[in-house]
Design a protein with these regions (language model features):
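Short beta->alpha hinge that forms the Motif I/post-I loop of the SAM-binding pocket
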Residues: 4-5, 39-40, 64-66
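Short, well-ordered alpha-helix to beta-strand connector turns
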Residues: 18, 32, 58, 109-110, ...
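Interdomain hinge/lid region at the active-site interface
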Residues: 172-240
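Internal alpha-helical scaffold of NAD(P)-dependent oxidoreductase catalytic cores
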Residues: 104-189
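Rossmann-like NAD(P)-binding element
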Residues: 25-60
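Short acidic-hydrophobic, aromatic-tinged amphipathic segments that line or gate anion-handling sites
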Residues: 19-24, 140-141
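NAD(P)-binding Rossmann-fold cofactor-contacting core
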Residues: 1-17
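Rossmann-like NAD(P)(H) cofactor-binding subdomain of soluble oxidoreductases
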Residues: 47-100
Length: 241
């Protein structure tokens, strides 16, 4: 493995997560068949540029970021033909990060989305399907545009909505919060720096989702303000389905 942080390298080896971890990127990738980037999304462009001059012929490069259109564009521009890029998005993990939270069952029955374009190498896609399946994942392939639209709705929008709910709540009131509130807002405790990258990398889809959410909340707000019982029930029942 590779990490530019010495503390991370020491921790990974101490926990037995990696047998070899180095701080020199060129040394880490010189003879590798597969590279997986697990860094903030906006670091990918620079890594692709560096890797283009380091990787052996035929090497596959992937990532585990939750947005995919920009990484595909950067890979085309920076990696070119130096390596074969396929996007990966394993739907696993939690709001926690760091090698100390590694688990051997992390990918058991988890969905993993591979993203491809017309120019994606088919054999690289096949290899990655087999790789993620071997870890226990259920693999599906999408194009990056569809991926980013879907995950704006089911992953990124819920995160910003949770953040909005927390920010709209009084800190003193939250001392009395029960399981319902905590379940609704848990994801907002993910690292802000990571999520800022996600939001900016998929900003158009997320902004559209926020607009739809505001429209739905406005309907409910109006019904509540006007005391329209049937309309409130209708809106809540629609969500319950």
């Amino acid at each position: 493995g590779y990490s530019h942080r010495a503390a991370t390298r020491r921790r990974a080896k101490a926990l037995g997560i990696a047998s070899r971890v180095v701080g020199d990127l060129a040394a880490a990738v010189r003879t590798t068949d597969l590279i997986i980037l697990a860094t903030p999304i906006f670091t990918f462009e620079q890594y692709f540029q560096e890797l283009a001059g380091m990787v052996p012929p035929g090497c596959i490069v992937t990532d585990v970021g939750s947005t995919k259109l920009l990484p595909h564009q950067w890979a085309d521009q920076k990696l070119g033909n130096a390596a074969r890029y396929v996007g990966s998005h394993p739907i696993a993990g939690s709001e926690q990060r760091g090698v100390e939270f590694a688990r051997d069952d992390l990918f058991d029955q988890a969905r993993c989305i591979l993203t491809t374009t017309e120019g994606t190498d088919r054999s690289a896609t096949k290899t990655l399907k087999e790789f993620w399946a071997a870890l226990g994942c259920i693999v599906r392939v999408m194009n990056p545009i569809e991926h980013d639209r879907v995950f704006a709705n089911i992953s990124h929008l819920p995160h910003v909505m949770a953040a909005g709910l927390v920010n709209a709540s009084d800190e003193e009131d939250m001392k009395f919060a029960g399981k319902g509130f905590l379940d609704s807002t848990r994801i907002s405790s993910g690292p802000a720096s990571i999520w800022t990258d996600v939001v900016l990398a998929n900003r158009e889809n997320i902004a559209d989702g926020i607009a739809r959410a505001i429209a739905e909340l406005s309907k409910l707000q109006g019904a509540i303000r006007d005391g329209k019982r049937e309309r409130i029930t209708e809106l809540l029942e629609t969500a319950r389905r």
